[in-house]
Amino acid sequence: FLPILGKILGGLL
């Protein structure tokens, strides 16, 4: 899992 995607998901959550 890419940290970039995690950052995006974290922003949405």
Curated annotation (Swiss-Prot):
Keyword tRNA processing: no
GO molecular function ontology, one term from the record: toxin activity
Annotated positions of the Leucine amide modification: 13
Location (main, coarse): secreted
Coiled-coil residue spans: none
Keyword tags: Amidation, Chemotaxis, G-protein coupled receptor impairing toxin, Mast cell degranulation, Secreted, Toxin
Expression sites (tissue/organ): Expressed by the venom gland.
A GO biological-process term: chemotaxis
Domain of life according to the entry: Eukaryota
One GO location term (cellular component): extracellular region
Role noted for this protein: Mast cell degranulating peptide. Induces the chemotaxis of neutrophils. Its mast cell degranulation activity may be related to the activation of G-protein coupled receptors in mast cells as well as interaction with other proteins located in cell endosomal membranes in the mast cells.
Similarity comment: Belongs to the MCD family. Crabrolin subfamily.
Annotated protein name in UniProt: Vespid chemotactic peptide T
Species per Swiss-Prot/TrEMBL record: Vespa tropica (Greater banded hornet)
